[in-house]
Each structure stands twice: as structure tokens, then as C-alpha cells.
């Protein structure tokens, strides 16, 4: 990229900065949840909603982000995303109750939902096609560093300052990013088709109310009848979307996508698989602090091997899938992740803390292999005219399933635990043991889906966007 103009390189730095902010925030909060609970006078069992409110908002807003960027301009939307994310961070730091914090996290989520996809779109518009891969590698590298630094930085800030600082550090960075965006980024626009507002609202309502209903009466404070009403509303909304999208060329996501078998299997497996794996980044630091008595900083440091294992495995995952095929790799990594989850629980409860970094490193390797395999399987056989829509749907499902996973983890803690648990409680480790056993079972379930994947070991990883028209 050395032959790119200076202005373009600065624009790539701005996009990379946005990726870093968004990825850092997805992990920096996890180690602070027990301290937040104590400060806000809440049970740690309720704090999973701090993560859910952010991730679910990202899932809901993702389908609209690309259309907004084309309609209003990439600079305007990227600037708006940074401003909303920064304001959300400020309101998070000022929150005095859990409900205030959840609303502020949702505002952060609106900004986060627009930041990454609009950043990708910006790179497509400012960089020549032949340099696109190199440019995307450059801007996504900070996004890989964010999860590495997040847990330890969050623990450090909580232990030596307060949890408010995990949000306050975003403010000066966000101000600089917003000013740089206005000064340096061009405002590309494109002619857009009419936005499928009806489909967007139906999907948003369906995803939001079903996730809320999953939290149960203990988590939401709602009666069983109200929970049943939420489930009914969510199911009706999703059924109405299916009816709306049938034979509708303007639908947010065309049902023609599901005529491709690998897409259907990959999407179903990704949804189920990320529900299980989405529990781990939330449960691990909470368990280390509340269940084992680790300090926030120590718990954050323990998460680093998992990220390192994930990053290291990305270098060889292509060769692994080419050698063994999607079915074998996905079934093996799904069952393997379940076993590693049990190994982590057993090692921790036995007090073999020196072994935990190695177990978490292994967990990161297995999880990374499964993620990469799920993503390429889902998209590899889509025709060109459905590839963009399929990628957007996969991105939405990834965020939705992670929010559901965290919700279920919180629900399990609530089912097995009392209203308040602490390190001094004699039943705390038993509560976590039952929760981890349940998680291991849930993580293993998608193996039944992946067992139906054709085991084509040739040309597995090349995303063959066959130039056939969708029928």
C-alpha cells in the first residue's frame, strides 16, 4: 500500500481506529461486571444484560447500516457512529442504576453497529480493487488487538481506578476520531433502492422480544404470562417477516438464500454454535472473580492466552479444512470445544491454576478453527447476486446468537444460584459447576447440524461465488 496517496492512508487509519474502538469495547466490559454489580447494588446474576443490550442492538441495527451509508454518505454515517459510540460511553460512565447503564449500552450499540460495516464499505470505495485485501488486512489488525488488550485493560482500570474508566477512556479517543473523520474522509454516496422498513421492523421486534423472553421471569421481573406474551409476539413477528419476504425482491434478506444447502446448514450451525461459544467470554472472567476469587486484573490477564490461541490458529485453519474437510473439522471442533470447557471447569475447581492459561490457549485455538470454518462454509457456494445479502445476514446472526448465548448463561446462573452469590458463599462453586456442565452440553449440540455437511475435502476454502443466477 506504499503507493497509495497520503490522504488515503490517513483514511485507512481512521477506519482502523474505528475497528479498534468497537472490538476493544466488546471485551473490556467483561472483567468489570462484578465490580459494576457491587457499585450499582445489583446481583452479579443480572449483569449479563450489560453485554446483551450492546450486542443485541448491534444485531438489530446491522441490516440498516450499509443502506444508510449509501444513502447519506460514508463520512456522515461513520462520523455519526463515532459520536453515538462516544456519547454512549459518556452516559455509561454517568449511569447510577443498571437500567440507565443498559440504555447507554444500547446507544453505544447503535454506533458500534454502523462503525464496522461502514468502515468496510469505505475501504471498498477509496482503495483500488487489486489492493483491497491488503487494505482490509491493515484496518482489521487493530480489531484483533482490541480483544487481546480488552480484558487485561478492563481489569487494570477496575482494580486501580474504577469501572467508570473503561468507558471514560473512549471519550478523548472518540473526539479525535470524529474530528479526523470530518476533516479527512470523503463522503461517498450511491443510488439506493427503497429500504425494506417493514421487514427491518419485523426482524428487530422478533429478535429483541425473544431475547428478552429468554431472560425469564427472574431476570426481567415479568410474570410468566408476560413472558409467554413476549414469546408469542416474537414468533408472530418472525413468521410475518417470512411471509413478507416470500416472492419480495425488495426484502431485507431474500429467502432465495436458503436454496443453497451449504448456506442453510452453515447459518443454522453458526447460530447454534455461537450461542454456546458466546457464553464463554462472559462466563470465564465472572467465574474467575466470583467463583475463584481472582482480582479483576488477574482475571483479565487469564483471558489473553485464549485470544493468542485464536490469533495463532488463523494462520493454519485453511490447511486444516483443506486436509480434513468441513464436516470432520466442524464436528471435531464443536465436540472438542465442549470437552475443553469441561477441562477448564475441572482444572479450575481442582485449584490447578497454573494449568488454566494452557487450557484457555487450547480453547482459543479450537474456537478460532470452528469460527473460520463456519463462516467460509456458509458463504462459499452463494451466487454473486446473493453474496452481499448472505454476508449481511450471517453478520446479523453472529451478533444475535452471541446475545442469546450470554442471556442463556445468565439464565443458567439464575436457575442454579440464589439471588445473590459471592466468593464467600459456600454454594457458589456448585452453582458455577452446574452452569459449566450445562454450557458444555449446549456447546456440543451443533455437532448434529455439522454432521449433515457434505465432506468435500477438495476446494473447501475457496469461496466459489459461482456465477449462476439465483432461481
From Swiss-Prot:
Keywords: Cell inner membrane, Cell membrane, Membrane, Transmembrane, Transmembrane helix, Transport. InterPro entries: EmrB-like, MFS, MFS_dom, MFS_trans_sf, Multi-R_MdtD. PROSITE patterns: MFS. It comes from the Bacteria. Its main location: membrane. CDD domains: MFS_LmrB_MDR_like. Residues 1-11, 70-76, 125-137, 186-196, 246-262, 307-341, 417-430 are periplasmic. It is found in: Cell inner membrane. Residues 33-48, 98-101, 159-164, 218-224, 284-285, 363-395, 452-471 are cytoplasmic. One of its GO terms (molecular function) is transmembrane transporter activity. GO terms for cellular component: plasma membrane. The chain crosses the membrane at residues 12-32, 49-69, 77-97, 102-124, 138-158, 165-185, 197-217, 225-245, 263-283, 286-306, 342-362, 396-416, 431-451. The keyword Phosphoprotein does not apply. It is a multi-pass membrane protein. Pfam families: MFS_1. Belongs to the major facilitator superfamily. TCR/Tet family. This is Putative multidrug resistance protein MdtD. The lineage of its organism: Bacteria, Pseudomonadati, Pseudomonadota, Gammaproteobacteria, Enterobacterales.
